[in-house]
Amino acid sequence: MSKVTSSTLLKYKQEGRKFTALTAYDASFASAFDGEGIDVLLVGDSLGMVLQGHDDTLPVTTAEIAYHTRCVRRGIERSLLIADMPFMSYATPEQAMENATALMQAGANMVKLEGGHWLLETVTKLTERGIPVCAHLGLTPQSVHVFGGFKVQGRDAENAQRILDEAKALEAAGAQLLVVECIPASLATAITQALTIPVIGIGAGATTDGQILVMHDVLGISSGYIPRFSKNYLKQTGEIRSAVRAYIEEVANGSFPSADHTFN
């Protein structure tokens, strides 16, 4: 079984083949997800909420992401492994280089950073030095206090255009993937069509090249608020591996996300 790389995902986009991603934080779940065919695994700073019990992702450290990245790496053979760069771990290009290096040495294939125009220099410098970058636009959880909560972004024309412009600029700067979160489906479509690189959506409609969800939502073990864009696949299948297969199948055939999981 050949390993998934950024080139694999680019080929999928060119062929119109949808791909799937999930968060993972340990070797056991990562192995199960990898074995069922999940293309991308993300060691997300979401672990601050779903594992550590925080109200947001801000307390997570680079050392914690590196620890979980090492755990996940030991459990996978095929999936592309992305590691989140936590809050304020990439405030300057120099800081980003140091922390991204630590995550790559922990086993990541790529690092993910939240932000737009202010990140362009950092993206270019990381890419030039051999560290692949996945950018993240829309609802960027590390900016939750700036947004005034976890809110859909890009609903008005001005902000939609800004997000589209930032997506193009990040691609030009060297980003190899882009995650768009909680934006209107029409904006996600425009971004996906405008970019050559693959676009992964979460709460962004069905037209993006790939979909990502938090594993706790897919397995119905999240506590408290359940995002509208998520779906509990364990409820309909009764078994973890079957739930993962159902998620993959529904993304592939276009039935997930449906209108119920999408913002306008």
From Swiss-Prot:
Gene3D superfamilies: Phosphoenolpyruvate-binding domains. One of its GO terms (cellular component) is cytoplasm. Its EC number is 2.1.2.11. Mg(2+) binds at D45, D84, E114. The keyword Transferase applies. GO terms for molecular function: 3-methyl-2-oxobutanoate hydroxymethyltransferase activity; magnesium ion binding. 3-methyl-2-oxobutanoate binds at D45, S46, D84, K112. Pfam families: Pantoate_transf (PF02548). Its cofactor is Mg(2+). The active site is at E181. HAMAP family: PanB. This is 3-methyl-2-oxobutanoate hydroxymethyltransferase. It comes from Shewanella sp. (strain ANA-3). The gene is panB.
